[in-house]
Amino acid sequence: MSGWTLNEIDWRAVVPGAVDADLLAVVKTAALVEANAADYVGYLSNVFAGDGVFLSAIQTWGIEEEQHGAALGRWAELADPGFDFAAALAAFRAGYRITQDVSQSIRGSRTGELVARQVVETGTSSFYSAIRDATDEPVLKVIAGHIAADEFMHYRLFARHFARYQSSQPLPLATRLHVAATRFAEAEDDELGWAWFAANILPKAPGAA
C-alpha cells in the first residue's frame, strides 16, 4: 500500500494563485483520470481472471490511483474555489468510459497488457516528478512527489508480473516494442481529451456538452 494518506496532507498550507492557469488546468485533468481507476480495475480483472495474485494486487493499485485523484481534486478545489471536482468527475464519466466487458487484453495477450501498463506507469511517474520540480506551491509539490513515488512503485509491480508471464507466455522483442510504441502514441487519446473538457471547458460553458 501507499505510504501516505489524505489526512497527512496539510491542506491549510495551500496557496491559491501560486500556480499559473496552465498548470492548474493540467492538475484538474489529471485528477479526473486518476480518479477513474475503477474502470481499469474492472478491465484488468477480466483480462487476468483466474490469476488471484494479480487480482489482489490490482485492487490495491486501484485504491491508490483513486487516492491520487482525490488528492489532486481536493488541491484543485482549494487552489480554485470555483472548481467542483465531483461534478467534473461525473461529467467525465458520463462522456468517457473504457470497455470492461472483455475476456482478452486489447494488446493481444496478458504479457502485452503488462508491457503497456509499464509504459503508462513510467510515463506518469515522470509526469508527476516534473510537476513536483516545476511548482513552488508547497502542497502540490508534496502531493506530486507522493504520486510520482507511487507510480514508480506501480511500474515495479507490473514489471514483476510481466516477468512472471514472460517466462510462461513470452512475447518476442519486436512485439513488445510494438505494444510499447502503440501505448506511448495513445498518450493523447480520447480519455485525456474528455478529462480536459470536463475539468476545464464544461464548467465555463455548460451548454458545450
List the predicted regions and their residue ranges.
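Non-heme di-metal
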Residues: 1-209
